[in-house]
Amino acid sequence: MADWFHSALKTCTHVCDFSDIKASSQQDFFCCDSMRGKLSEPRKVLLVSCFVSFTGSFYGSNRNVRGQVQLGMQQDDGVVRPIGYIPIGGYLYHDDYGYYQGEKTFNLDIESDYLKPDEDFWKRFTINIVNDKGLDDRCDVKCYVVHTMRIKV
């Protein structure tokens, strides 16, 4: 990692909005360095970390909701596997709205091979809302994802 210290820093951001929680609440997105055609020399990319934060609400009475925000990444074999989970949930005693929020940074440290100047570095990610208890159409979650990359020529 020390040899990456003086390399350029770049971020890639995404917002995943789940206006209600369904049986399958998943959104796919791509992290990309967007450097195709901007440099004349080959480069390497280090995908340093992924920061995920979320806010959400739920409605009900005497209601206990629990679940997880799952971050997944497509591996080299083409399969999307979980990187980590962030718990979500809360409890209400009366008819009202409840709120939940959370955040976590996942350290990745994934280094690419040398990339040609005419190609982008990219990785496919997913955000999946896992319903452990009570997350349904009366619940919403908005996730914010920030990937941090280093680019070395």
Curated annotation (Swiss-Prot):
It comes from the Viruses. The lineage of its organism: Viruses, Monodnaviria, Shotokuvirae, Cressdnaviricota, Arfiviricetes. Keywords: Host cytoplasm, Host nucleus. Its main location: host cell. This is Putative nuclear shuttle protein. Coiled coil: none annotated. It is found in: Host nucleus; Host cytoplasm. The keyword Transport does not apply. GO terms for cellular component: host cell cytoplasm; host cell nucleus. The gene is DNA-N. Putative nuclear shuttle protein. Disulfide bonds: none annotated. Belongs to the nanoviridae nuclear shuttle protein family.
